[in-house]
């Protein structure tokens, strides 16, 4: 009985940890070999992130993004490699007459995308999904600057270990609707590296105070880097 109980505990604990990481034998170079489901991390043609060398475009005409963001409740979920903020809302963005509904936010340190080789200290990914399961992601660079009051609500959640704790976040106060962005078709930046993600990488970084950035890195990311290296880009498609 004791042996059965011990095995059950081991299986339960192992299920709480991911089989991939950002270091060593389970790091990004090996993701594609860890599982059949992860094969696109190795053989995918449109993988993310990338080093962006092409021009930014205006938010308009063929690449117009319409935002429908309002104050929405968000809940955190601590993961082994990251922290996920999940939204309980019907907020969405519209691109080419299709609505993509707000799903979740992740942070990466340092930034995963580069712009002509330049990397920022932090990058925020806002994921959306359409009714037919297509993904659209906003990538927003973060740099050290003025305190951003809206992010204090997320940081307070990181400090709150109470199960089911929520905060109300207004992304309309974070996302700069008038900003230029870089657009390309890519993938999720973590296993299984599924492709078909429409990436909108905002050109202008937003600001957070050094203290805010450090809290996100230390509390949310456990002080560890979690950026996938840039992938080969196929510019002939654009």
Q: What are the roles of these predicted feature ranges?
A:
Residues 1-4, 117:
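Positively charged n-region of N-terminal signal peptides that target proteins for export
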Residues 16-238:
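Alpha-carbonic anhydrase
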